[in-house]
Amino acid sequence: MIRRALVFLVRVYQRLVSPLLPPACRFYPSCSAYAATALERHGALKGSALAARRLLRCHPFHPGGIDPVPESER
């Protein structure tokens, strides 16, 4: 249930806030897409940790690149 609420919040951000901002993510997939996939694939706790780690790396001094969400261990 928490996972679904967090994914919902990310989707709201993607549809309402993100279109108003210039593209700034240095990674593919974008940080918000990464967060939604991580939450769906790994659940609220681990997915949030993966998303937070990704957001901390998304800055002008990091080269960026392709960074897929790790597969679930289940």
UniProtKB/Swiss-Prot annotation:
Q: Which Pfam families does the entry mention?
A: YidD
Recorded hits in InterPro entries, A to Z, give: Membr_insert_effic_factor_YidD
Q: Which domain of life is it from?
A: Bacteria
Listed SMART domains: Haemolytic
Q: Where in the cell is it found?
A: Cell inner membrane
Sorted UniProt keywords: Cell inner membrane, Cell membrane, Membrane
UniProt membrane topology term: Peripheral membrane protein
> Might you report a single GO cellular component term?
plasma membrane
Signal peptide residues are none
The function of this protein is: Could be involved in insertion of integral membrane proteins into the membrane.
Q: Belongs to which family?
A: Belongs to the UPF0161 family.
Name recorded for this polypeptide:
Putative membrane protein insertion efficiency factor
Organism equals: Anaeromyxobacter sp. (strain Fw109-5)
Q: What is the lineage of its organism?
A: Bacteria, Pseudomonadati, Myxococcota, Myxococcia, Myxococcales
